[in-house]
């Protein structure tokens, strides 16, 4: 079964690089990673005007990781549900995993554990997001409140 990972991104940085590294190290192969970048109007204009788009982190990552597909939406068109739905429509996989750009897999078995229940009669599987080790107190509280053990 093919598995795609869908990640909306906004002003991506090193967190996204770390996430991609961990996704490519998973025990279950990922068919493709669909990134949907939200762009401010000025960012979209400057990217279109650049003669060398090589400076874009996402374009660099797409070259480094061959299974990445890039899409973009304008900031004013971004909607949590509709943006993800658009990405799902770009997927041809049997299973898709939705992630956020700041959620790092704690181990190499995240995709395996998330998708294993879907091989049977289960339609949805989910995981909790742990706080980062060096996070602020508010992030630690929010993660523990939203995703209790």
Across the structure, where does each feature detected by a protein language model lie?
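Short, well-formed alpha-helical segments that are part of the catalytic scaffolds
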Residues: 12-25
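The conserved acidic donor/metal-binding loop of glycosyltransferases
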Residues: 100-104
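Conserved donor NDP-sugar-binding/catalytic core segment of glycosyltransferases
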Residues: 108-139
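Cell-envelope/extracellular polymer assembly enzymes that use nucleotide-activated donors
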Residues: 2-4, 32
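Short aromatic/hydrophobic "clamp" motif used to bind/position activated sugar donors
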Residues: 96
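Glycine-rich, basic loop-to-helix element that forms the pyrophosphate-binding segment
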Residues: 74-91
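Acidic donor-binding segment of Leloir-type glycosyltransferases
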Residues: 22-72
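Short, flexible, basic/aromatic active-site loop/helix in glycosyltransferases
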Residues: 142-149
């Amino acid at each position: 079964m093919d598995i795609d990972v869908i990640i909306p991104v906004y002003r991506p940085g090193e967190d996204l690089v770390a996430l991609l590294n961990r996704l490519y190290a998973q025990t279950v192969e990922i068919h493709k990673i669909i990134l949907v970048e939200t762009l401010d109007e000025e960012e979209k204009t400057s990217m279109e005007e650049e003669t060398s788009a090589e400076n874009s982190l996402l374009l660099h990552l797409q070259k480094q990781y061959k299974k990445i597909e890039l899409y973009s939406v304008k900031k004013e068109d971004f909607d949590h549900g509709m943006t993800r739905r658009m990405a799902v429509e770009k997927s041809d996989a049997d299973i898709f995993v939705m992630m956020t750009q700041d959620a790092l897999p704690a181990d190499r078995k995240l995709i395996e554990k998330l998708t294993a229940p879907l091989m049977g009669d289960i339609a949805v599987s989910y995981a909790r997001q742990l706080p980062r080790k060096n996070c602020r107190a508010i992030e630690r509280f929010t993660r523990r409140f939203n995703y209790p053990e």
